[in-house]
Swiss-Prot record:
Part of the 50S ribosomal subunit. Belongs to the universal ribosomal protein uL24 family. This is Large ribosomal subunit protein uL24. One of its GO terms (cellular component) is ribonucleoprotein complex. InterPro entries: KOW (IPR005824), Rib_uL2_dom2 (IPR014722), Ribosomal_uL24 (IPR003256), Ribosomal_uL24_CS (IPR005825), Ribosomal_uL24_KOW (IPR041988), Translation_prot_SH3-like_sf (IPR008991). GO terms for molecular function: rRNA binding; structural constituent of ribosome. The keyword Ribosomal protein applies. Gene3D superfamilies: 2.30.30.30. GO terms for biological process: translation. One of two assembly initiator proteins, it binds directly to the 5'-end of the 23S rRNA, where it nucleates assembly of the 50S subunit. One of the proteins that surrounds the polypeptide exit tunnel on the outside of the subunit.
Amino acid sequence: MAAKLKKGDRVVVLAGKDKGKQGEITSVMPKDNKAVVEGVNIAIRHAKQTPTSQGGRIAKAMPIDLSNLALLDANGKATRVGFRFEGEKKVRYAKTTGDVI
């Protein structure tokens, strides 16, 4: 099945502690049905100091389930994603506006 959300898409969080936050998808894990969104679902990781890197508390964006994300349309509102054929090509489009993504 084709991916409704892809790397680089602007999304909004629908549920959880970060509900309402917006960000850009930095990576998608289709097998786990999760995505990492910039600035969302941040966890603090404690890193030990090494000769090459400084130790301390490091903020890291953790994966969030794809069902808790919605794509932002041109108006900045959450939308569902649909697929249609334009000529020979299958394209994604925003269900609220009908615009091709």
